[in-house]
Amino acid sequence: MNRRRRIYEGKAKILYEGPEPGTLVQFFKDDATAFNAKKHEVIDGKGVLNNRISEHIFTQLNRIGIPTHFIRRLNMREQLIKEVEIIPLEVVVRNVAAGSLAKRLGLEEGTILPRSIIEFYYKADALDDPMVTEEHITAFGWASPQEIDDIMALAIRVNDFLTGLFLGIGIQLVDFKMECGRLWEGDMMRIVVADEISPDSARLWDITTNDKLDKDRFRRDMGGLVEAYQEVARRLGIMNENDTPRPSGPTLVK
């Protein structure tokens, strides 16, 4: 499609003006970042895989009645989405101890949590996205108490769905991050799932081997990120079985 006016550029995506009022085009970049972009490389093919995987997940969420901003995929790197007012919070749902939770609480990575835990982080790169409580959220007006309830209800439903989806293809959903936005339809407003859900924003471990199939491969310098994302896509049925990773591995552009 013809390139339109750029609205916003983040670490992994660019938002462009959409073809119709109330729509945007979301472009998936090949940039891989970690630790709030303190670590950064460009990995050829990552954006294409995230676009396809996120499309698959959001299509399924829409199908089972979980509202999202997703309309349809336009091409290999772009999606048509509904324009929403993003709530400045990262919502993290944790099922297994890993990453910052394991470090913060002294838990062994891989420990199954007593129940799923929902955490909120304020979206501010300059502050390293600090963890915040519901008190912070309401005091600073980032979301109302009712909106927090709606966000938590969505998070629980998405977690239930994703846990089952990935379990069915031999993958354990360790944790994931999602974002929400306010979708205005006339005088009515509702909270919907926005941004993306992909191996960039979820920890995915092979159930049998515990191999990491997510962005931890980049965070921890393990290599094989594109191959891991391809494996997730293959198991989800959105890549042909005979598609194989390039023997030379992903191309890194410094």
UniProtKB/Swiss-Prot annotation:
Keyword Phosphoprotein part of the UniProt annotation: no
Annotated GO CC locations: cytosol
GO BP term, example: cobalamin biosynthetic process
A single MF term (Gene Ontology): ATP binding
Organism: Brucella canis (strain ATCC 23365 / NCTC 10854 / RM-666)
CDD domains in the record: SAICAR_synt_PurC
Pathway(s) where this gene product acts: Purine metabolism; IMP biosynthesis via de novo pathway; 5-amino-1-(5-phospho-D-ribosyl)imidazole-4-carboxamide from 5-amino-1-(5-phospho-D-ribosyl)imidazole-4-carboxylate: step 1/2
Protein's name according to its UniProt entry: Phosphoribosylaminoimidazole-succinocarboxamide synthase
